């Protein structure tokens, strides 16, 4: 059972029991560790070293939250001073502000705002992530955790122990690489890198052609496609994926692939059929030195028109078709429904401003024509138009 602590300045502090920690891969609290509370943060000391930090909801009126992290923070002067980690650093008073600067190590568990995450800070990998629907309170957490524990098998515990003790691994990637990713606790999905923006940005031809729709993407960007396929194992015949539909191409930072969160399981050369699912963005230029144009980016196809032509249509929802957002995680909302229905309708119900959505077919036709392309043609057909 969870230990429920007394109130302190409107805070109800909950501490997991060691028996419960094993289900989350968390380090047990040793019997000789001493507890110190600073506002809504609970610290556990092993002598003068802080070994664990648990953060609770700040006030009783807030939604229930729980974040448990392992740390290794040395203190001095009767635990009132945090010692620096480097020679250049300066000692700091141990207070709430100081605790926000602690660097987590190893396993951590987060339950906050309906999100659940079990992860390893050292390897930068996530073992499990989900979003729980319902009113955010401790009862909802208890229901989730009871189900989690009851469904945990010995094999699950072994996998969690392996995950806990992994070292950080990096993997090289290239266009065409097929990767696997976890869906829920025991299923896998599959994706493919169709444009390695990181590498292409280094090419003179890429810069010469501007490619603003790709160049403006933040960070170490990749364009990937996610297949309509789910499996209880990542060990599949990747040739099967060639026969699968996919979600529309999306931009994602490379972190989860680079740090092996999404293991690469093979390579299938990128074809123009893959590029039919390519990323599509239309926008007026945001480049101060090239502000008199608007552009369309369709995969590696880049086209421009005078801004004056684009402005004639700005009242027609066109500004919403700029599609240059990017994050660390794949956008797989609706993937299960899309896979079952063999359709991307559910995806487009969520991503309503995507120009590739069927409901925007008329706008897509007009926009493609304005930029010298043809929305009725596939990617290969539009490549041929560009050569004329």
Q: Which role does the model predict for each range below?
A:
Residues 136-227:
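Short N-terminal edge-element motif at the start of the domain
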Residues 200-277:
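Structured domain cores in non-transmembrane regions
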């Amino acid at each position: 059972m969870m230990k429920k602590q007394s109130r302190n300045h409107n805070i109800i502090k909950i501490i997991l029991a060691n028996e419960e920690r094993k289900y989350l891969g968390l380090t047990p609290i040793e019997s000789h560790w001493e507890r110190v509370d600073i506002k809504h943060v609970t610290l556990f000391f092993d002598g003068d070293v802080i070994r664990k930090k648990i953060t609770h909801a700040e006030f009783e009126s807030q939604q229930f939250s729980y974040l448990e992290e392992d740390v290794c923070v040395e203190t001095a002067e009767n635990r009132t001073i945090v010692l620096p980690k480097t020679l250049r650093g300066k000692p700091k008073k141990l207070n709430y502000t100081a605790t926000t600067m602690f660097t987590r190590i190893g396993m951590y568990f987060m339950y906050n705002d309906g999100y659940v995450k079990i992860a390893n800070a050292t390897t930068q990998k996530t073992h499990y992530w989900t979003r729980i629907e319902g009113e955010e309170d401790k009862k909802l957490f208890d229901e989730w955790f009871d189900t989690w524990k009851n469904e945990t098998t010995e094999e699950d515990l072994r996998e969690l122990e392996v995950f806990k003790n992994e070292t950080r691994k990096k993997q090289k990637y290239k266009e065409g690489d097929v990767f696997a990713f976890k869906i829920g606790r025991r299923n896998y999905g599959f994706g493919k890198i169709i444009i390695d923006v990181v590498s292409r940005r280094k090419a003179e031809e890429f810069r010469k052609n501007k490619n603003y729709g790709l160049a403006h993407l933040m960070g170490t960007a990749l364009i990937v496609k996610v297949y309509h396929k789910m499996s209880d194992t990542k060990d599949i015949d990747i040739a099967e994926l060639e026969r699968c539909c996919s979600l529309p191409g999306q931009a994602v930072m490379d972190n989860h692939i680079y740090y092996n969160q999404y293991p690469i399981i093979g390579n299938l050369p990128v074809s123009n059929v893959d590029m039919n699912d390519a990323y599509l963005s239309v926008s007026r230029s945001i480049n101060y030195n090239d502000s008199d144009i608007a552009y369309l980016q369709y995969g590696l196809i880049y086209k421009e028109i005078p801004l004056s032509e684009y402005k004639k249509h700005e009242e027609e929802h066109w500004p919403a078709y700029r599609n240059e957002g990017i994050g660390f995680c794949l956008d797989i909302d609706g993937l299960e429904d899309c896979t079952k229905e063999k359709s991307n309708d559910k995806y487009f119900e969520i991503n309503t401003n995507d120009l590739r959505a069927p409901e925007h077919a008329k706008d897509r036709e007009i926009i493609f024509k304005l930029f010298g392309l043809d929305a009725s043609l596939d990617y290969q057909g539009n490549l041929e138009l560009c050569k004329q």
